[in-house]
Amino acid sequence: MAISVNLDALIPRADFDIVESTSQSAPPQTMQIRDLEKDAFFYSGLRKPDFQRETASWSPRKVKDFVKTFAEGDLIPAIILWRSQGSTFIIDGAHRLSALIAWVNDDYGDGSISRQFFTHIIAPEQVKVAEKTRKLINKEIGSYADHQFAIKHPEKIIAGSCKPGQAVRSSIRHLAVGNRQLRKSRSGFLQDQPRSCPN
């Protein structure tokens, strides 16, 4: 049996009714990754229609591959959304959007959103798969939090020849770029150490 990452808790379900809107404002045609943060207004209105299948069929590698595709700026398939009664329903692309939400919120089926959804009762197998997914993502891409740190503090990043997706390794909370590595010392300051580009 294949091991799947359970991302079903990340987008709540709701009854999908098409209601004519009298609003004159058009919904935004694009969204930013920060719109998927747990406390973001856009994220709070996301819903999966009841007829959507569970978002629990992707392997850890497939979740990692999709997040990597996004992080490296490659083309990803469109996600189809529908606004109705103040909610934004995901008509197509629930797995893709859930994978990004998982990365942004560090919740691969075992984080705070999932714990609340499952009333803090998460199967050990689900926790194990979530940890495996997190490890794969942190190794190859880096956590969203580390990417945000790199964006907010570019002066702490030493320019190098590595691909951006390889730059951050949250498993040891350091930033690696080019032939240098920044690592937090015991005193809390960043120290650079020689390091080759990760493969």
What are these regions, as identified by a protein language model?
Residues M1-F42:
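N-terminal leader/domain-start detector
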Residues V19-Q29, Q52-N199:
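Basic- and aromatic-enriched surface patches that contact anionic nucleotides/nucleic acids
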Residues I33-G45, A159-Q166:
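Short, compositionally biased low-complexity segments
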